[in-house]
Amino acid sequence: MSPTPPLFSLPEARTRFTKSTREALNNKNIKPLLSTFSQVPGSENEKKCTLDQAFRGILEEEIINHSSCENVLAIISLAIGGVTEGICTASTPFVLLGDVLDCLPLDQCDTIFTFVEKNVATWKSNTFYSAGKNYLLRMCNDLLRRLSKSQNTVFCGRIQLFLARLFPLSEKSGLNLQSQFNLENVTVFNTNEQESTLGQKHTEDREEGMDVEEGEMGDEEAPTTCSIPIDYNLYRKFWSLQDYFRNPVQCYEKISWKTFLKYSEEVLAVFKSYKLDDTQASRKKMEELKTGGEHVYFAKFLTSEKLMDLQLSDSNFRRHILLQYLILFQYLKGQVKFKSSNYVLTDEQSLWIEDTTKSVYQLLSENPPDGERFSKMVEHILNTEENWNSWKNEGCPSFVKERTSDTKPTRIIRKRTAPEDFLGKGPTKKILMGNEELTRLWNLCPDNMEACKSETREHMPTLEEFFEEAIEQADPENMVENEYKAVNNSNYGWRALRLLARRSPHFFQPTNQQFKSLPEYLENMVIKLAKELPPPSEEIKTGEDEDEEDNDALLKENESPDVRRDKPVTGEQIEVFANKLGEQWKILAPYLEMKDSEIRQIECDSEDMKMRAKQLLVAWQDQEGVHATPENLINALNKSGLSDLAESLTNDNETNS
């Protein structure tokens, strides 16, 4: 008897994996871990789970001992190598990262996240992406909750950029499909007029609010005092607009819209009446370049009353406010899929938004520095944003187009048709004119002279039809004046003479009679014809009988099997007949005008006889087009000696009809 294999022991395996993991960390080599993994008895899943626990145990000890970030990152790097070698589960590195970021303070989390950013290519690989994308998203969201939006602005931005690099553009978790707003972004300002300091003189405001040291700002560099006095009402209305920018849905309410309209007109009037000088902005820009060009960005507006004068004198601040207007107007005018049906602008609101948009662009172009260029750039970006809105309204379809599966049989690529194939020498003996209707008309009668003599080409009217109107006018009871009679029309008289010469024996006048004028002659002929022609009732009855005969003939013609056979074969008929044809396809091929090269191509494409037969019929259908009818196929079968198949196809065709 062969010895039984040793059983898997979790404590023993975990001890061995822990020891080999520490050895691999010390040697900075994964070989000891691979060797232990191959020596430990048990299934692969059991060993992977045990090694995952060993990694988490070692990481826990390092965190408790307050080890450096380098030691922690070494463990995670070793786990990544283990996943690549197939000895760890794919989620192990992400679980370790989550444990580390949950336990370390924010300053050390910055170092750990730098490691995460550098390995974004690893996380996007096929081995890690599907297993770790949810871990990374949850880890980043937990980290964002711990960070302060005002104090850790840069760190928050790095996390958002990392997520943008990690996930594809069509990832649903980052698209805000329902167009929700960040209602938590509340702008706090002084709402108590009693506590306002704007009523004091400008000098007192400057002394209490800002102590300017000597040499900090000269008299020439100081902003000029606003020509429109800034009071508490302007301050309150200005900062109240931020609530509409935060939640644009308020603009669809009647009362809120009136408030927004009133506040906006006053604020924009201030911007129009107090325009900035380009020299001050240029001087400020030059000073920034001399000092290194460092630009400090604040995520929130400073709403102190003492800064109102300086803010209105700042070109960047004005650009922020005007840009908020343009973004708000674009949302109000745009088509948003999840916008309520009640959120519709009136014609008056739409007109005001259109006029105000032009005013805002004008203010942007007048705002230094490079106002004209900045205005055009903003307009271009907002126009491009319309494409993004349309894409979201369509449900964010993927930009990667998948190749459609082709289930149809491969069609044989044929060379250009030889002249004899369309000059009446094919199996159908038809001359192809290059157009379906022209081909049908040309082949109705092969002999052109016989076609010209056909009774169907007789377009000359009968005497009854042509002279019917003249006979009615000649009747005295109708009391038609001579000048209105048709016989007095020269054109009518010319055609009447030609018809009488062909159809009537009274055309030739006896030589002993005096020649009359054309109207008198026609009047005399009309009287003679009226006596010879049958009464109208008999004529109508005869016409009805002829119509009935024509209808019966038409019905019989429609019921003719020849007409039904003129229809081209369908794909279903080809599929059924190919199964019956089978191995005899090669006998039929020459009679379908197939060349030897095409027959060899069919033999090379498939080993299955039924598939070869199907390819033969498909190639014949492509070659003949609308002339690939069951009747032509039956003729080819009879010529090739396959009478049984021809009879079977005839019966199937009659049954389907």
Swiss-Prot record:
Position of the Glycyl lysine isopeptide (Lys-Gly) (interchain with G-Cter in SUMO1) cross-link: K595
Induction per the UniProt record: Up-regulated during cell proliferation.
Motif (Nuclear localization signal): 414-430
Positions of region (Disordered): 194-222, 533-569
Domain Death: 570-653
Record PTM: Expression is altered specifically during apoptosis and is accompanied by the appearance of novel forms with smaller apparent molecular mass.
Protein name: THO complex subunit 1
Protein source organism: Homo sapiens
